[in-house]
């Protein structure tokens, strides 16, 4: 069975009950393009001591826990977008920002086709929920709530942990 089918079937049933501005019909004859999004796996430190990574509890559908992020605005660089989104969503200033991977599977978000540029960064303060986040919190990597993650964020975090453990040598996913 298609990997995306099972995971997003439940999302589909939730989505059909939610009114979404993004679900409006495109202009006839307009070219359809994926939506560009960005996320950051934020490593939180207390001085030099690693505390865990930041996750959010989404405040609107699709609900669940997620890596913080959002859409890149027209005229904005991906790097500026991820910094803006982290200020708006979790009230953090990023340090040592590095591009990690690009995720572009068309079914990664059941609402629309999106291309996500994922980064890794450091922060030296605790997150605070804002914007779309109902909650923002730090989770130890051993306590990641795998079954509660939205979108393809379990895959992204598995890739991150592989990279951190040395099982993947490239920051950019092949």
Which positions does each model-derived feature cover?
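Bacterial N-terminal signal peptides that target proteins for export
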Residues: 1-9
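Bacterial N-terminal signal peptides
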Residues: 9-18
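Conserved N-terminal beta-strand and adjoining loop/helix that marks the start
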Residues: 25-53, 68-71, 120
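Active-site-adjacent beta-strand/loop module that shapes the phosphate/pyrophosphate-binding cleft
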Residues: 35, 104-127, 160
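Conserved Nudix-box catalytic region and its N-terminal flanking loop in Nudix hydrolases
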Residues: 49-89
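A short coil-to-beta-strand element that immediately follows conserved catalytic motifs
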Residues: 92-102
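NUDIX/MutT-family hydrolases
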Residues: 120, 128-162
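Charged phosphate-binding loop/patch that engages nucleotide di/tri-phosphates or the phosphate backbone
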Residues: 156-174
């Amino acid at each position: 069975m298609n990997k995306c089918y099972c995971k997003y079937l439940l999302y589909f049933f939730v989505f059909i009950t939610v009114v979404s501005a993004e679900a409006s019909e495109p202009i006839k004859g307009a070219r359809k393009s994926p939506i560009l999004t960005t996320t950051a796996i934020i490593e939180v430190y207390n001085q030099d001591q690693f505390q865990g990574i930041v996750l959010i509890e989404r405040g609107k559908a699709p609900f669940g826990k997620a890596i913080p992020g959002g859409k890149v605005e027209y005229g904005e660089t991906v790097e500026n977008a991820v910094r803006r989104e982290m200020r708006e969503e979790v009230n953090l200033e990023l340090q040592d920002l590095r591009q990690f991977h690009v995720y572009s599977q068309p079914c990664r978000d059941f609402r629309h086709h999106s291309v996500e540029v994922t980064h890794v960064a450091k922060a030296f303060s605790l997150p605070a929920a804002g914007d779309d986040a109902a909650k923002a919190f730090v989770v130890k990597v051993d306590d990641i709530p795998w079954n509660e993650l939205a979108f393809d964020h379990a895959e992204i975090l598995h890739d991150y942990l592989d990279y951190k453990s040395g099982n993947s040598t490239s920051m950019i996913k092949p």
